[in-house]
Amino acid sequence: MLDLAFRNVAILDGTGTPAFTGDVGVEGGRIAAVGEAGAAQTDIDGAGMCLAPGFIDTHAHDDGAFLRYPDMTFKLAQGVTSVVSGNCGFSAVPADPAVDSARASGGILAGLESGVTDLASYFDVVLARKPAINNMMLVGHNTVRAITMGMDKRAPTQAELAAMGDHVTAALEQGACGFSSGLIYRPGRYSDTEEVATLAAAAAPFDALYTTHMRNEGDRLLEAVDESLAIARTADVHLHISHHKSAGKANWGKVGDSLAKVDTALRAGQRVTLDVYPYTAGSGRMIEYFNLDRINLALAEVIRIASCPAFREFEGKMVPDIAQELGLTLEETVLKILTAEKGDRTICIQFVIDERDVETNLAHTDMMVGSDGIPDLKGKPHPRLFGTFPRVLARYVRERGVLTLPEAVRRMTSLSARTFGMQERGEVREGWHADLVLFDPATVNDEATYDDPKREPSGVAAVVVNGELAWTSRDGKGIHMGAGSGKMLRYRNNAHGESSTK
């Protein structure tokens, strides 16, 4: 007898082909039947709803969240069953007890424990928490640089470069799916192209990825794309461009030129993919966006405070409104926030992206979806943390028709699984891991807003992680089932396979 069966569902198998009606059966953590399914211990009637592979968040910062919030409600409620963490050059590993890696990340890695030193120990600690969803890891440039040479603004010595390379290789040997950089952030911004290419080349023997938050996403976007392509060519690795955008009103429309460069590289045989979040605002460490000697007033005008340990009362407010309340200029307000104790850990939201660019991005066939959510639940985070995947289905499929439903599901499932080496995931296929999401295509919607960013989405009826019912709903209210069935995923070309909670 099957453990679980979905009956009378519109099956979107993740390949981009049209939906077909049938049943899907689950047994022993795997998909046991597609089309017709026999008797099951638990039946779920999915008439009028779609069953798809669980969504894959290709751009997460959940390294520490798996320890602080192992229930991972903000992802599970969206139908996300797997994430890729360690992005933007910040990763949980390697870790050195003598170095505060949270300092380099501005608190993004908060929650890590002293027992974590490498990927294997990190996976062990996370699995002990019984995580709700699956996690795959990148190893971050900023992290290995901070551990090796601190926050020094200089080129590494040959010995330091070799030490960084050893850290990257060690993580890849233990199953990391690639090497990530965040070249807008310290200390990564102090590196030159050659340094990054040398470290990215460590991924080549593993056929792993180089993912990048590029050096510039605004005025010098096109030059940054050229650099990223050159790094990947030199290193002979697959390039994945994170949260592709052209920030700042003067740069709106440049995503078309940027994507043209990507297409040229693809035609030349280079391996390139991208991801995007479906919002017109970004979010990150506020300190990284300002030169304190010369405050960018135009940028300050469009910034909202998401998390501010120094001034919790500022959270959820725009900088101009804070300035008015305090009787300060914009410049004085920014300096007050950023120079306060723990001011460098302030997370802000910047309204700098054009809606038409979001649509242009989503229309590109190699574009995946990554939330880029920063899981700080104390403040008012960017709503993408809770809403990214339902927003794609509601706004860009149902309302705007930018993507067909089968194509949107492909971008959020099989394309992501294949790119990041998640073995036997990302499709509704017999014998594959049973990561599944049941949703109503007519009502699925992101409910999170900038004013109320922690609202769970609507229209997600059930989520299965590794064969166990992890999320369901009753009377429109989501219910976390506490399954704790998530696994730590190792890259497809790593002989060790997966780390399981079982």
Segments (PLM) and residue ranges:
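Conserved short loop/turn motifs at secondary-structure junctions
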Residues: 59, 183-189, 214-219, 244-251, ...
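Hydrophobic faces of well-ordered beta-strands that scaffold small-molecule active sites
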Residues: 56-60, 83-85, 135-139, 179-181, ...
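Polyanionic/metal-chelating signatures
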Residues: 94-115, 122-123, 142-156, 167, ...
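Hydrophobic, small-residue-rich alpha-helical packing segments that form membrane-like cores
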Residues: 88-95, 108-234
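Active-site microenvironment of metallo-dependent hydrolases
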Residues: 1-22, 27, 291-502
